[in-house]
Amino acid sequence: MANKNDYFSLRNEHTNDKIDELLADLPYFCADFFYGIANNTSALTRLNYAYDLRIFFTYLSEIKKIPVEEMSLSLLDELKAVDIERFLNYLSNYKLNGKKLSCNERGKARKLASIRAMYRYFFNHDMIKANVASKIDTPKLHEKEIIRLDGDEVEQILNLAESDAAFSGKKQAYHNKLRVRDHAILSLFLGTGIRISELVGLNVDDFDFDNNSFVVTRKGGNRTILYFNDEVKDALYEWL
């Protein structure tokens, strides 16, 4: 587990660098949008916006026969709702960098949300006349099946972390050194259901063993208290 300040700072720094790279592939006016929302969105949210908008403007470049670098903000006023709906339909089967790709309803909904956020920003700042993106219905999302491990599967994973049957020589010595750590991390991960990104951002100071609780940093930066059972506590105690 990493020092949480270093982990999140480095992650945000890397994410912001990637956003700057993607801005080079977007129309010049998109920089105003990204700088304008920087104080009320996370870096990961902005990165997703950048990826989605790159696909959107690449599509418009092909359809309108206008290089992305020559697009002006007036283009957003020229587009009709049907133009964005055609883009969503295009996402069912499209190419990016020579690769064939396809978006399901959830992917289309995310890209529409990115387009809406951009339109909303420029409309609220009186930089465009209309917000046509707000007129488009969100693609219907089908309920996503949640796949869970049963008790036996969880036990098998934890037993595998402790077993040295698959190792020999130097690998076994290395495994023996990290066995307790791996078991503790997997116990916490499987016992609480936190995300991997939340797990790697934890620090020893985040844990309160008197109350079997810990503080996790959620998506968006919110801090939440979660609880673990005695089995997880014992595994963490053995390691820490």
Which residues does each PLM region occupy?
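Conserved catalytic core of the tyrosine transesterase superfamily
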Residues: 1-240
